């Protein structure tokens, strides 16, 4: 199922509500954001693994500012869908995760977060691959 850019889709799975969203302006922002993250990955050996060392969202890079604004909007959309009608305060914390061929991402959770999300700047072609992960034992 596909939705227009900027229109969130909500799915009630288990007691957890999932939200998917194609960010408006992603076609222009993603290449710029990818270049920025790849440069950061080259300059910082532990960028992907040392996620507590920095916060991507404090950057003043235009593509990161765009992503931060989109994430703030997504938090408001999610909270509204959950029926939260009062003012909510939050802090965005994020990091770039650059995976090369053969890399993997362990199953995990974020126990100190009331909301977690992932934004994929680029993904490889999945047309000829089988399921890349089984969630029979989710984190």
Task: Spell out what each predicted region is.
Residues 84-94:
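A short coil-to-beta-strand element that immediately follows conserved catalytic motifs
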Residues 13, 86-88, 109-113:
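A generic structural micro-feature
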Residues 93-139:
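Catalytic core of non-heme Fe(II) oxygenases with the double-stranded beta-helix
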